[in-house]
Each structure stands twice: as structure tokens, then as C-alpha cells.
């Protein structure tokens, strides 16, 4: 479900880099969607080898350019790349990846980010560094909740309230079902604390 949601933010004309490529599943689905240039980046050889193995099974590779890169974050991305996905990491690590390659990050058309932890830290970093949050989603996947942030550099420092930083300015507007479920779960949890302590 998370993967499918991330894919909705990728167009078939995009040139994609997937940072922290895991098994290459996102790249495979992006290629199936029509993306013609995919770069998979990881700082460990095992995930890259696993991704290579999985991508070799694809029939459509003859008209697709796939680049495998052993590197940290966005440091060695191809100059043609216009969209980056950085998913399944802590928000502090995602912020660090962007900071380490700030010039490259701000030149991209969009950063599609999915942090497992420290999402508030990531939002604060983005807005303080001149990135605008252009879209967000909130997904429940295998009984865990995940916000997805789409950001683009604008140079403008956005002003967000503490509630917007905590939950996401666009997530609060969209009020998706999974977000409502999350708030209800939190309410039950907080009530349990209140009445059992």
C-alpha cells in the first residue's frame, strides 16, 4: 500500500532515483509504470545485489536505463535525475541525506519522502531550508501508520503551526480515512493511559 501511494507521485516521464533501494521493488513498479531511467542507490552492496537480481527478471529492461550505484544518499546521482524517493528511514536520516547533497536536492522537481520516525524533525528541516511541502498522504500499512511527504525547493521559508508540523499541513486538510483511524487509535491509547494510571 505504501509503495503504491509513493508511485502515484511518480510520472512515467520522470527520471527517478530511489535512495535506499531495498529489494528494488519501487524501481520495478516505476518501470512497469513506464519510467525509462531509474537509478538505484544504496550504501550497502547486499541490497543493491538483491535489487539487481530482482530487476533481471523484468522483461521490459531492453528499453529502460537502470543504474546501480553504491553510494551514500544523493551524492552520486545521475545529472538527468529529476525525482528522488527516500523511503523507509528515520526523518533525521532523510534530512541528513538532503543536507549532504543540498545543491542536488534543491535542483530536483520533487522529493518523495517516507519517514518511519521523526517526521516532525523532517518537516521542520524542510520548511527551514526553503522546501515547500507540495503534497502529503497518510497511509496505514500492515497495522502501522506512515506519512508520505512530497517536497520541492522554492527558496521560501514556510510558516507552519505546531499542529501542522506534527501531523502535516496537507494531511490535516485531506483528512484521509487512514489519518482519521490514526487519530482514533491515539485517542483510545490516551484514554487508556488516563483511566489506568
Language-model features and meaning:
Residues 49-78:
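S-adenosyl-L-methionine
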Residues 24, 28:
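Glycine-rich SAM-binding Motif I of class I
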Residues 1-14:
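Conserved alpha-helix/loop element of class I SAM-dependent methyltransferases that forms part
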Residues 37-42:
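Conserved SAM-binding motif I beta-strand of class I
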Residues 46:
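Conserved Rossmann-like nucleotide-cofactor binding loop
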Residues 81-88:
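Short SAM/SAH-binding signature in class I
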Residues 13-22:
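Conserved class I S-adenosyl-L-methionine
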Residues 76, 92-197:
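Class I S-adenosyl-L-methionine
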Amino acid at each position: 500500500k505504501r509503495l503504491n501511494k509513493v508511485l502515484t507521485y511518480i510520472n512515467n516521464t520522470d527520471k527517478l532515483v530511489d535512495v535506499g533501494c531495498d529489494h528494488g521493488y519501487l524501481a520495478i513498479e516505476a518501470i512497469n509504470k513506464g519510467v525509462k531511467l531509474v537509478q538505484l542507490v544504496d550504501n550497502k552492496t547486499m541490497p543493491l545485489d538483491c535489487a539487481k537480481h530482482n530487476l533481471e527478471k523484468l522483461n521490459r529492461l531492453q528499453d529502460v536505463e537502470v543504474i546501480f550505484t553504491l553510494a551514500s544518499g544523493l551524492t552520486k546521482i545521475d545529472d538527468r535525475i529529476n525525482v528522488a524517493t527516500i523511503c523507509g528511514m528515520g526523518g533525521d536520516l532523510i534530512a541528513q541525506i538532503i543536507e549532504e547533497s543540498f545543491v542536488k536536492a534543491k535542483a530536483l522537481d520533487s522529493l518523495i519522502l517516507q519517514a518511519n520516525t521523526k517526521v516532525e524533525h523532517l518537516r521542520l528541516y524542510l520548511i527551514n531550508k526553503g522546501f515547500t511541502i507540495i503534497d502529503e498522504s497518510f497511509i496505514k500499512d500492515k497495522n502501522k501508520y506512515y506519512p508520505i511527504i512530497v517536497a520541492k525547493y522554492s527558496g521560501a521559508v514556510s510558516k507552519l503551526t505546531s499542529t501542522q508540523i506534527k501531523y502535516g499541513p496537507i494531511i490535516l486538510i485531506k483528512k484521509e480515512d487512514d489519518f482519521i483511524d490514526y487519530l482514533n487509535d491515539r485517542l483510545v491509547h490516551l484514554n487508556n493511559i488516563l483511566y489506568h494510571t
